[in-house]
Amino acid sequence: MLARQQPRRVARELSLLSLSQLSRKDTKPETLEQGDLEALLLAATRTLSGEVHEILETASAELSRSHERLLNSEIRASNLNSAKAMLEEAMTLTETVINRLALAVDLPETLQLAGQMEVRKFALELIGTVCRRRQQIDEQLQEAMVDWQLSRLAKIDQDILRLAIAELDYLGVPQKVAINEAVELAKRYSGQDGHRFINGVLRRVTEKKTDGAPVTPGEPR
């Protein structure tokens, strides 16, 4: 049985997708009004809706390729080794299809939750906090990164970090929860090792808050 998604986790995902829209606009984050935030949230919801169709189309194409490999293993394979290789490729493609479909099954619930007042309220609060406190948040992140530059990170990684700091400093979310949720967002939207980097940066931020000790230069743990 599929686990039910948490409303706040959906709100975080919507917030991240909303912030990604800002990079495509000339509007400065700190000048956004409530109507602008609502429009960003609507665009994020539509992005999720389009993702369902894209996932299903990709899964369908991969399933067709898997079927083709199975046929080739029976008809064209010249020996046992080549047949085995084709079967393994077909199995890998099928596994990928199953994983994609599992994600597609979750998305309708995400879209349903996105329309709930509780989810929208927290998402708007998150987006608004990041926009209003952008300078303070970025300064804190840059200090924790030391000889790394926040501006050189992928935009999606910057926004994941900003959301986490907004939760930690301004919304009263416990450290462990804020960091874990940021890591989960990174696993889905960041690069291959993005979640480890983000975890390291946020750990440094919280350690610095706790003991006030200077941060040692180098890559975040």
Swiss-Prot record:
The keyword Transmembrane does not apply. Disulfide bonds: none annotated. GO terms for molecular function: RNA binding. GO terms for cellular component: cytosol. Belongs to the NusB family. HAMAP family: NusB (MF_00073). This is Transcription antitermination protein NusB.
